[in-house]
Amino acid sequence: MKHFILTTIAAVILVGCSSYKDNDKVELLIEKTSPNGKFIATSFSCSGGGAAGYFYYNANLRRVGEEMDQRDCLLGKHKTWMAFNAIQVRWLDDSNLEISYKQNNSPAYQDNNSVKISSKYGVAIHHVVKN
């Protein structure tokens, strides 16, 4: 009985610690490499979460050669909220990236939408809301 309980606890812990990276379905919608070839800006969608589930669009900036992390987002406080859509990425030059998008402006999203990354890796990120 003790062995059964320990095995059950271990299984619950392992299942609870499974990586979202392995279980999420990510679709890369747009990828643009910076003019100097050092960075990649990506617009993507992500779905997962099992029975409760989630689906969202967001943007990511990473160094060339790095794997994209779908939770390392440039838009929003809560990364799995469906707050943004129609996301476009465009390099203005080596150190300036423009992200344009539509956002959900309902009161429930006000706090979430107030968080937007303005700089990463020395690249200035310019946000253009298209509503």
Model feature map: region roles:
Residues 1-4:
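Positively charged n-region of N-terminal signal peptides that target proteins for export
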Residues 47-98:
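Mature extracytoplasmic domains of secretory-pathway proteins
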Residues 17-68:
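N-terminal export/targeting and maturation segments
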Residues 6-9:
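Sec-dependent N-terminal signal peptides
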Residues 18, 76-131:
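Acidic, small-residue rich beta-repeat scaffolds with periodic aromatic anchors
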